[in-house]
Amino acid sequence: MKILFISLGCDKNLVDTEVMLGMLASRGYEMTNDEQEADIIVINTCCFIHDAKEESIQNILEMAEYKKNGSAKALIVTGCMAERYRQEILDEIPEVDEVLGTTAYDRILDAVDAALAGQHEVMTADLDALPLPETKRLVTTGGHFAYLKIAEGCDKHCTYCIIPKIRGNFRSVPMERLLKEAQDLAEQGVKELILVAQETTLYGKDLYGEKSLPKLLRELCKISGIRWIRI
């Protein structure tokens, strides 16, 4: 079966998309960029600002039309908008089969199975969970560079920002996990890593009791094949 994946929003969202793509590819699904031939459509949404929310809604409505009039059998919505407007999406857009919250994207295979079985539900997890699937990412950035998400969420609950409510509190990815992921990316031909997080310089404080970005950088520099690291 063929899957169309639409990824909206920031680089951190793109990393989640690549993780889901890797999981789907491991199951044997074929990726396509053609809405007309897609059996399953997945939209990884953003709603950080009003324009991003509008773009997400527009994409969902457009893909809902392809589901009604094309070959698509399932429409799945993931990401920040899915986390914020969980039930509303299912209630107001009946073409949507499954909604995955920001910390439940590692259940994408379950969501596909449920959608194809005709179920309509919201899949969520604890907002402070940290999904760490073992499947290798499917890099979509052209091969020579890739984003490495070193942390998730934010502890600063600013009145103008919704990130903690849709991404949870700040939590670092364990260093050994990041080094393994970076090694996997290097083996796929990646030469340049771009480290991303909501608060990059805070990396490691929650896990190791002190800011550990310098140590992480030193360890990443030891990986053969990685020539550049951007922060």
Identify the residue ranges that each predicted region occupies.
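Periplasmic OmpA-like peptidoglycan-binding domain that tethers envelope proteins to the cell wall
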Residues: 206-207
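Alpha-helix-loop-beta-strand connector modules within alpha/beta enzyme cores
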Residues: 210-228
